[in-house]
């Protein structure tokens, strides 16, 4: 990596909705900066599920090293916590080797767990939440943010004064448990923001993105997606498994079982993928540190942003 010696390990995050073009750009970045890709996709962790997860092809994986792909069988339980425990050491090791990690994928919770950690939430006190909501209505979010800064300055520093939901939630944690939210995170073994991350999210206008999604589903079918699903069922992976209930796989399973027509399965697959893309965008928009880049400008703009980050930091 270029630049001086950062106080924290550096990571490039490349995220965005499904079908936006993350894989191509991630590989280009890794090649240009001598980096390696760490996948952040909740479905690409599974073996034998290649076409329906839009997993990088063997040829693409041969161009640069990939991590966190094909690390579990479809009948294994896999969570954001397990992902973070596996991916964090990889990010650390790559930094120690002087290799730039490119954390690329569309599963926002996995990215968050890896970069910032997760902590076990206590059961929220509904009465406290309702009272804090009323106070936010009467006094404004900024006033509650000032209160949070007194009892939990670490969390307050990470939350924008206008982010009412997170302010109220953090205050509720403190009032209900006597321990700040930052204390809960530390108590459960997660360091506070151990990485210096440049977060880049690719976006496209809705019409173009949805067109790409529909086309990609057609390509998956042409590449043998139905055969892939039939092969998983033949291996003994039950339709009820969490992995088999994901988008695409549940639709093809329903068709193969005779429950719906092929036409309906394909249309539902496209529709649910579009809905998922919309939810992904909503998730990423909630991150104030995200740098948004039009996908059409990605190959030119993103390398510039990375060079600036490596030289000067954020």
Curated annotation (Swiss-Prot):
It comes from the Bacteria. Keywords: ATP-binding, Magnesium, Nucleotide-binding, Transferase, tRNA processing. Its EC number is 2.5.1.75. The record marks 107 as: Interaction with substrate tRNA. Gene3D superfamilies: 1.10.20.140, P-loop containing nucleotide triphosphate hydrolases. It holds the Pfam family IPPT. InterPro entries: Dimethylallyltransferase (IPR039657), IPT (IPR018022), P-loop_NTPase (IPR027417). Transmembrane segments: none annotated. Its cofactor is Mg(2+). Residues 41-44 are annotated as: Interaction with substrate tRNA. Substrate binds at residues 18-23. The keyword Transferase applies. The keyword RNA-binding does not apply. One of its GO terms (biological process) is tRNA modification. It catalyses: adenosine(37) in tRNA + dimethylallyl diphosphate = N(6)-dimethylallyladenosine(37) in tRNA + diphosphate. ATP binds at residues 16-23. One of its GO terms (molecular function) is tRNA dimethylallyltransferase activity. Catalyzes the transfer of a dimethylallyl group onto the adenine at position 37 in tRNAs that read codons beginning with uridine, leading to the formation of N6-(dimethylallyl)adenosine (i(6)A). NCBIfam families: miaA (TIGR00174). Belongs to the IPP transferase family. Monomer. This is tRNA dimethylallyltransferase. The gene is miaA.
